[in-house]
Curated annotation (Swiss-Prot):
Component of the mitochondrial ribosome large subunit (39S) which comprises a 16S rRNA and about 50 distinct proteins. Belongs to the mitochondrion-specific ribosomal protein mL37 family. This is Large ribosomal subunit protein mL37. GO terms for biological process: translation. It is found in: Mitochondrion. GO terms for cellular component: mitochondrial inner membrane; mitochondrial large ribosomal subunit; mitochondrion. Keywords: Mitochondrion, Ribonucleoprotein, Ribosomal protein, Transit peptide. Disulfide bonds: none annotated. The keyword Heme does not apply.
Amino acid sequence: MALASGPARRVLARPWGLGLEGCGVPRRGAYEWGVRSTRKPEPPPLDRVYEIPGLEPITFAGKMHFMPGLARPVFPPWDPGWTHPKFRRLPPLQEHPLYKDEVCYIFHQRCRLLEGVKQALWLTKTKLIEGLPEKVLSLADNPRNHIENQDERVLNVISHARLWHSTEDIPKRETYCPVIVDSLIQLCKSQILKHPSLARRICAQKNMLSTTWKRESTLIQVHGSSGAQLNAKDPLPPIASREEVEATKNHVLETFSPISPTISLQECHIYDVNDDTGFREGYPYPCPHTLYLLESANLRAHRFQPDQLRAKMILFAFGNALAQARLLYGNDPKVLEQPVVVQSVGTDGRVFQFLVLQLNTTDLASEEGIKNLVWVDSDQLLYQHFWCLPVIKKKVVVEPVGPTGFQPETFRKFLALYLHGAV
């Protein structure tokens, strides 16, 4: 009989026999299998120079390299003579040249007003009128202002943006939304031969607006870029008559107590109160005509609700009108002899919002007196849905590729706003 080795004898001597739950593998501790501890090793002690009063430490600073037995020298922080932007330390806010003790509530392009249009009307001291003005609707209904093969060309614009422009099977909203608006503007420009005064306009992109006003005791500012902006050499004519403007004195603005009217606005102590239209002095197209605001976020959570988009349109149109009025009539709050009119179009590529704002007064501090006017036409569908891929059931094409539920009246209003002031 062969003699068993030492480990084998120890295993056989155990009452439970072979290990690993009786499978013949001996049990060992965790460290016997080579498993290391997950505890991090202690950091090495810091090399420091112990200062003893009356004694000077001997370091290897003069040697210019490490020497065992000598203390590690302590050098002062290195000053390269310039500051890297990554490591620049900003001064305290109170030392900023534009710092002010009075807080300013700023509305920028990503602000979402909690109360929507109702809050925007209070901030701008404006009276809301549903629907577009009769003057604009008459331009939309007049067949002389229509484009040749208008409906067919608009359908081609929609198909170009949703189907032909992108190589993706289903283009994203951020891709097709700007293409639709740009193509519709180009389609409106084709009327220059019929209306030569349309050549006195230009479309600018990403201009920065900044204007500030007092609303009661609150300082409010609109700051940022609204997207594409149509500017003209000549201002838009007033919409409401003098009698209609005087009648706004009796209008009472709706409040939303106990909610603060400045909710959703950004509080800031660093701001500039000077007005800036986004264009230099002497710009040949100084008058704002129409703002085109796009809501092209792909994720639904990042999109503006329709009411929030209309509120954004009101504030940016009001900011452009106020900056233009102060440029023409000065900074003193007063009732304007010639009201300033600014239009706005907002869309997500499918649903359009139309707006016309008339600035009647720059006296915005009190609730009394003349109010501004805004006409809003909400939720106008250009088309119901667009099938990027055909729907096939039982080898039969149920839904072909293309738009469904096309509504030509929406583009007529779009065209009427573009032609307003030139016809």
